[in-house]
C-alpha cells in the first residue's frame, strides 16, 4: 500500500494479541480490494465513482475468496468482504494478523450485536428439571444442516454431554448427527436434503423417520413445509405438538407481535405469556424479556491486515461514501462487490481479530463441529505440489462450510502409486480418466462412485483430433509419419480413442502387437505421450523413447530443471493433459493433438491468459474427422473419435457401504456448494495457473454413480478392442 504520510496518533488497539497503532492521515490513500476475478468489471465500475473521500480503491483479482484471504495476509491486497466461515479460515492461518474492521448489518436491526441469536423456545408450563430432561421431548427445527435449528443445538448439547457419541466409526458424520437427534427426541421435524445423494437421503429418512413425524408432510420431509424455517419452528411449537423449538430471536419477536429493532409492535394471535426461552443453564426467561442465547451468528463484514488498520478510518469513510452512491443509483456493483443492498448498511465495529470475533458469539465451535476421536477424513490422492496445494485449500474451504468428513491430502508420485495407496488403505479417492478407471477396476480392485458432469452434455464428453487449420491433413491415413500430442498413456481422449480409430480403420493391424509400439511407429515423426516411461506401464524402453521424444518437461522452468519432469503424466510435464496436449500442438511440437471437445474453446479467444495461449484464435484450428474431412471446433457432435464417459472418482472396493456413502456425501456436497458459490472456492477451473487439478477444469458438477450408463457400456466395447493386444503382465 503506497502513501505519503503526515500522521496524528489516535489510539493503540490489540489484534490477535498484537499492539497495533492507529493513525489518521491527512493525505489520501490507495486501498487494494480483493475480488473474485469474475467480478472485476463490476469492481472497476465501483472504483471509478467520485466520492467525498479522496481515497482510491484499486481492484485486485483473485481466483476466489480463499485466495483473497492469502493475498490480504501477504500484503498483495488490503481488504475484502468475508463471511464468518471465511473469518474462521483466516483465524486458523499461521502467523496471521487479520482484523475485522467493519460489519454488514441490517437496516431492520442496525444496533444488534449479532446477525442473529440462536434460542430455544418452550411452553411456559413445560415441566423440566434442567437441560438433561429435554430427552424425549418433541422438537421443532429449521432444517437439516442449518445454523440455529441444527448446528447450534447439536454443538451445544454435545458440549454439555446431553448428546453422547457422535463418532461411531460405521456411520457417516451426518448419520451420527441424525442418530443423536433421533435418540434424544421422541419426535421432531428436521426437513431438507439429509444427503445431496438421493439414494442416501431416502435411506436415512427411512432409518430415522421419527425426525420427520412433526413435519407437515412426514413422508416427504423436505422444503417447502409449513413447520420448517425460522417461523415454521414456532408454528410447529404452537400448533403441531412441538414442545421445544430452535430458532432465532427476531422471528420469535415477529411471531408474538413484539417490537423488532426499528419496527414497532404488530398485532398477533399468539400469546407470548404462554412461552419462555430455555437457557443453556436450564433457567427460563420470559419471551418479552431479554433472550438467553445458545450461540449467535456474527455479521458478515470486511477484513484487513495489521498494516491497513493504521489508516482504516479513511477506508471506512470510502466504503460509506460508496454505499450512499450505490444505494442512490441502484448500482449492481453495490451487492456484487461490497455485498451491501437496500436492506443492509456498513457499520464500524471495534477492530478485532477474526478468531476473537467468532468467539464473542460462541460461534467457533459451531463452525468446527467435528466430533471424535476418531476424526474421520476423506483422503484425496494427489500427484504433485500444485494439486497438493489445491487439495489443502479445498480442505479448509469445505470444513469451514460444514462439509464432513474433512478432506485430507496424500501425495504420491504416479497414478499407479495412488491406485495402490487406495487399494492398500493409504488413501481413499482419486479422480481418473475413463480409461484409467478400467485399469483401476481390473488391476487394483477399485470402483467408480462419483462422476464429473459437463454442462449440457451431462456425464460424458467427446474425444477429438485437432489440427492447425493451415495444415494439409484431411484424414487419419494422412497422419502416418506425423508428430502427435497426447494427454497421457491409457487416457481416453489422448490414447484410447485415437488408437481405437486407427485400429478401426485398419491403419494399425489387429495383430500388430503391442499396440503401443504400433502407435509409436505410426507417428514416426515423434510423439509426446506422457506416462510412457512410467515402469508401471511396462512400455519397452525404445518405444517409450519415441513416445516421449516431443515432450518438454517443465518448459516454463528457468532454473535448468526443465527436463527433470520430461514425459511425466502430470502437470510437471507442460504437454501433459488436455491443455498440455493442445499446447504441444500450438508450440509446433506436434501436427495433431488428441484432446476433448472443450479443449480448444477453453484455451483460445482470450479464455486462457497464459502467455502461450493469450493470443490464440479458435478459428485457426479444426477437428480432423475419423471418416475423412475436417470441421470447425464447435462441430464435435458430428466430428469426433468417440463419445465417452466422464472422469470419475474411484475408491476401494473393500470399503463398506457406509464408508462409501460418507465419501459420496462429501464429494457431492463440495460439487454443489462450490458450483453454486464458486466465488467462495473455485473447485473447477485453473488453480495458480495450473489446469485440471483434482478435477477437470471443464467439469460443472459432481454426481453419484449408482449404475453403468449407456455411454460407459459403449466405451467398454472400445476398451475391449484396444486391450485385446496388451502385453501380458
Model-found features: residue ranges?
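N-terminal hydrophobic or amphipathic helices and topogenic motifs
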Residues: 2-77, 82-85, 103-115, 167, ...
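Gly/Ser-rich catalytic serine loop of serine hydrolases
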Residues: 37-38, 64, 145-147, 229-230, ...
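Extended intrinsically disordered, low-complexity coil regions enriched in Ser, Thr, Gly, Ala
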Residues: 51-56, 91-95, 146-164, 327-328, ...
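Short helices/loops that flank or line small-molecule/ion binding pockets
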Residues: 65-81, 85, 89-94, 132, ...
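Beta-sheet entry/capping signal
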Residues: 78-79, 138, 243-244, 301, ...
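Solvent-exposed loop/turn segments at secondary-structure junctions
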Residues: 86-89, 125-128, 144-148, 250-254, ...
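Ligand-binding "clamshell"
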Residues: 89-109, 255-291, 439-454, 470, ...
Amino acid at each position: 500500500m503506497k502513501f505519503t504520510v503526515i500522521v496524528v496518533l489516535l489510539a493503540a488497539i490489540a489484534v490477535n494479541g498484537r499492539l497495533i497503532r492507529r493513525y489518521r492521515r491527512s493525505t489520501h490513500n490507495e486501498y487494494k480490494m480483493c475480488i473474485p476475478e469474475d467480478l472485476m468489471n463490476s469492481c472497476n465500475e465501483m472504483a471509478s465513482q467520485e466520492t467525498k473521500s479522496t481515497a482510491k480503491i484499486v481492484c485486485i483479482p483473485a481466483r476466489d475468496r480463499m485466495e483473497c484471504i492469502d493475498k490480504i495476509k501477504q500484503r498483495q491486497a488490503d481488504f475484502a468482504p468475508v463471511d464468518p466461515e471465511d473469518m474462521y479460515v483466516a483465524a486458523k492461518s499461521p502467523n496471521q494478523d487479520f482484523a475485522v474492521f467493519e460489519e454488514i448489518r441490517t437496516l431492520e436491526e442496525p444496533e444488534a450485536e449479532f446477525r442473529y441469536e440462536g434460542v430455544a423456545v418452550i411452553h411456559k408450563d413445560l415441566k423440566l428439571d434442567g437441560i438433561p430432561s429435554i430427552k424425549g421431548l418433541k422438537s421443532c427445527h429449521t432444517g437439516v444442516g442449518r445454523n440455529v435449528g441444527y448446528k447450534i443445538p447439536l454443538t451445544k448439547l454435545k458440549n454439555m454431554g446431553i448428546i453422547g457419541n457422535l463418532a461411531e466409526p460405521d456411520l457417516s458424520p451426518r448419520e451420527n448427527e441424525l442418530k443423536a437427534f433421533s435418540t434424544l427426541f421422541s419426535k421432531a421435524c428436521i426437513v431438507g436434503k439429509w444427503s445431496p445423494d438421493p439414494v442416501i437421503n431416502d435411506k436415512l429418512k427411512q432409518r430415522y423417520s421419527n425426525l420427520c413425524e412433526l413435519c407437515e408432510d412426514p413422508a416427504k420431509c423436505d422444503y417447502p413445509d409449513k413447520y420448517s424455517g425460522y417461523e415454521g419452528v414456532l408454528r410447529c411449537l404452537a400448533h403441531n405438538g412441538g414442545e421445544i423449538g430452535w430458532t432465532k430471536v427476531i422471528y420469535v419477536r415477529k411471531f408474538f407481535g413484539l417490537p423488532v429493532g426499528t419496527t414497532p409492535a404488530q398485532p398477533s394471535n399468539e400469546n407470548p405469556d404462554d412461552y419462555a426461552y430455555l437457557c443453556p443453564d436450564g433457567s427460563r426467561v420470559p419471551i418479552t424479556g431479554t433472550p438467553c442465547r445458545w450461540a449467535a451468528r456474527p455479521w458478515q463484514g470486511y477484513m484487513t491486515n495489521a498494516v491497513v488498520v493504521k489508516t482504516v478510518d479513511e477506508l471506512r469513510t470510502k466504503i460509506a461514501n460508496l454505499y450512499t452512491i450505490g444505494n442512490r443509483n441502484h448500482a449492481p456493483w453495490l451487492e456484487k462487490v461490497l455485498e451491501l443492498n437496500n436492506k443492509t448498511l456498513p457499520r464500524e465495529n471495534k477492530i478485532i481479530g477474526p478468531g476473537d470475533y467468532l468467539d464473542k458469539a460462541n460461534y467457533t465451535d459451531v463452525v468446527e463441529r467435528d466430533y471424535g476421536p476418531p476424526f474421520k477424513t476423506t483422503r484425496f490422492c494427489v500427484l504433485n505440489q500444485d494439486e497438493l496445494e489445491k487439495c489443502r485449500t479445498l480442505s479448509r474451504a469445505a470444513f469451514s462450510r460444514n462439509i464432513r468428513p474433512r478432506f485430507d491430502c496424500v501425495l504420491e508420485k504416479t497414478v499407479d502409486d495412488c491406485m495402490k495407496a487406495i487399494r492398500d488403505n493409504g488413501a481413499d479417492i482419486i479422480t481418473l480418466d475413463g480409461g484409467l478407471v478400467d485399469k483401476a477396476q481390473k488391476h487394483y480392485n477399485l470402483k467408480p462412485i462419483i462422476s464429473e458432469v459437463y454442462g449440457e452434455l451431462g456425464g460424458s464428453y467427446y474425444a477429438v483430433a485437432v489440427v492447425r487449420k493451415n495444415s494439409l491433413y484431411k484424414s487419419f491415413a494422412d497422419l502416418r509419419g506425423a508428430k502427435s500430442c497426447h494427454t497421457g498413456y491409457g487416457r481416453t481422449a489422448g490414447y484410447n480413442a485415437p488408437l481405437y480409430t486407427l485400429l478401426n480403420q485398419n491403419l494399425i493391424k489387429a495383430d500388430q502387437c503391442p499396440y503401443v509400439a504400433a502407435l509409436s511407429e505410426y507417428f514416426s515423426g515423434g510423439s509426446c505421450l506422457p506416462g510412457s516411461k512410467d515402469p508401471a506401464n511396462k512400455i519397452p524402453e525404445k518405444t517409450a523413447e519415441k513416445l516421449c521424444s516431443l515432450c518438454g518437461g517443465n518448459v516454463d522452468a528457468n532454473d535448468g530443471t526443465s527436463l527433470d519432469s520430461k514425459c511425466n503424466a502430470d502437470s510437471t510435464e507442460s504437454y501433459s493433459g488436455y491443455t498440455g496436449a493442445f499446447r504441444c500442438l500450438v508450440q509446433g511440437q506436434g501436427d495433431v493433438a488428441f484432446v476433448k471437445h472443450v479443449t480448444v474453446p477453453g484455451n483460445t479467444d482470450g479464455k486462457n491468459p497464459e502467455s502461450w495461449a493469450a493470443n490464440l484464435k479458435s478459428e485457426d484450428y479444426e477437428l480432423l474427422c475419423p471418416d475423412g474431412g475436417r470441421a470447425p471446433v464447435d462441430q464435435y457432435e458430428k466430428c469426433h473419435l468417440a463419445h465417452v464417459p466422464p472422469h470419475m472418482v474411484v475408491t476401494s472396493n473393500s470399503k463398506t457401504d457406509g464408508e462409501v456413502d460418507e465419501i459420496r456425501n462429501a464429494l457431492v456436497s463440495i460439487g454443489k456448494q462450490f458450483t453454486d458459490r464458486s466465488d467462495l472456492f473455485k473447485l473447477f477451473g485453473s488453480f495458480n495457473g495450473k489446469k485440471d487439478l483434482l478435477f477437470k477444469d471443464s467439469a460443472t458438477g459432481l454426481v453419484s454413480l449408482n449404475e453403468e450408463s449407456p455411454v460407459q457400456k459403449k466405451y467398454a466395447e472400445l476398451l475391449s478392442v484396444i486391450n485385446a493386444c496388451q502385453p501380458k503382465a
